[in-house]
């Protein structure tokens, strides 16, 4: 069989398969390549390695309490809406607040919010939204709050082991099938628990069993590292984000992001951090210089100066992105 005959035989086989199972059976491998939703943090986009959260994939953001997981997810919501995307929020915890959304720069009227009564209903809603092909991003808050219907309807004495994990496994299989044909990104917010009886090594485990680990293209481990203060007032937290699983770029990269209360990320500050790291802005003593020009004395004054001088800031920003692109090639 020569190469032309083999190619023709393959084309005929593909036509037969598409005739039997539908035109969407096959797609080009490049169909979702380089399509991302920005995280809102240049540092995090750089750690992920492709410039943001990949479209058409499942993402897990997990960590301990008060580490910034929800705000990190909401920053992605903000970026998606800013680019004209459609976003749904599955509020299983019933904790979303319109005032907080407004503080983060998110218009609450542009966010579709669902509050499912039980876990299976949440998965049905997510699957239906994916199949519309009209929703770009779905955030699920949180895995621990996706309680199986059987657990809700049963008495405390009748609770059985493993129902949550089984529900997650079944639901994720359904979502994965739908996502293979659509562009929606689904972010699951998850918590960590301590394993009982573990004396040595890592005693932490995420809720919901192993299925989410398996189906996730990207897993982000979020840990609060320190408080950000202005004088004696706590104005935010610094969190370490580690990419523990990455199927679109090399894994295990990490970054430290500053999350300010009622604001979220500060992109301007991150640009300045990168500019100093790449020596686009140079430091001598307490003074900062750009192209031999003295900008400001002290980091706070530098931040204020660049926020007030847009032309110089935009010039530095372009150089930073050029450097990031060069390093990611």
Swiss-Prot record:
InterPro entries, sorted: AAA+_ATPase, DNA_recomb/repair_RecA, DNA_recomb/repair_RecA_CS, P-loop_NTPase, RecA-like_C, RecA-like_N, RecA_ATP-bd, RecA_C_sf
GO (cellular component) term, any one: cytosol
Record keyword Zinc present: no
Keywords assigned by UniProt, alphabetized: ATP-binding, Cytoplasm, DNA damage, DNA recombination, DNA repair, DNA-binding, Nucleotide-binding, SOS response
CDD domains recorded: RecA
UniProt superkingdom: Bacteria
GO molecular function terms noted in the UniProt entry: ATP binding; ATP hydrolysis activity; ATP-dependent DNA damage sensor activity; damaged DNA binding; single-stranded DNA binding
Gene Ontology biological process terms in this record: DNA recombination; DNA repair; SOS response
Principal location: cytoplasm
Subcellular location: Cytoplasm
SMART domains in alphabetical order: AAA
Chain positions recorded as ATP binding sites: 63-70
Family: Belongs to the RecA family.
HAMAP family: RecA (MF_00268)
Function: Can catalyze the hydrolysis of ATP in the presence of single-stranded DNA, the ATP-dependent uptake of single-stranded DNA by duplex DNA, and the ATP-dependent hybridization of homologous single-stranded DNAs. It interacts with LexA causing its activation and leading to its autocatalytic cleavage.
Record protein name field: Protein RecA
Source species of the chain: Malacoplasma penetrans (strain HF-2)
Gene assigned in the entry: recA
